[in-house]
Amino acid sequence: MVNLINGKTPTEFIIGGLIDYLEKKTDLKILDRDIAEDIQRPCIILDVAKITKDLFGHMPHYNFEINVYYFANSLYRGYADLYQKAEEIMDILSGRINLTDTFNITVEDKQTEFYRADKALKVYGTIDAVFEYEDDSTADIMEELNINLQEG
């Protein structure tokens, strides 16, 4: 079983933390909507393409395939902006991303794609996260022990 982290599921914790991190580092609003919808430029959209969950020993292991889309200020010019933002986003996603004092993630296998006609780019990669295992089989025993100690 996975502990909730700050009251959030592991998926909410990782994706929410990454959105907060990107907003802080880019000074842009990270939109949470379908790319086909009308978007206000410039902006970033974080898209989680795939989430897989399995066990690493007894510990829950999550893998996230993420796409970070950047839409330039203008549809009519902005190649230089795209190249600069690609470099900036790659740098932001490099190294450890601290979500809390004790939990960090890394984005691996980062690559970029440019959509020149749309004046947009995509930086994509994967996040692997392993969470602590909590053995619930001892939880009732510990609760009973705690009650007995308080009464005793």
List the predicted regions and their residue ranges:
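Charged, amphipathic alpha-helical segments and their flanking helix caps
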Residues: 1-31, 50-152
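Short acidic low-complexity segments
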Residues: 31-40
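A short, hydrophobic beta-strand-centered structural micro-motif
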Residues: 40-49
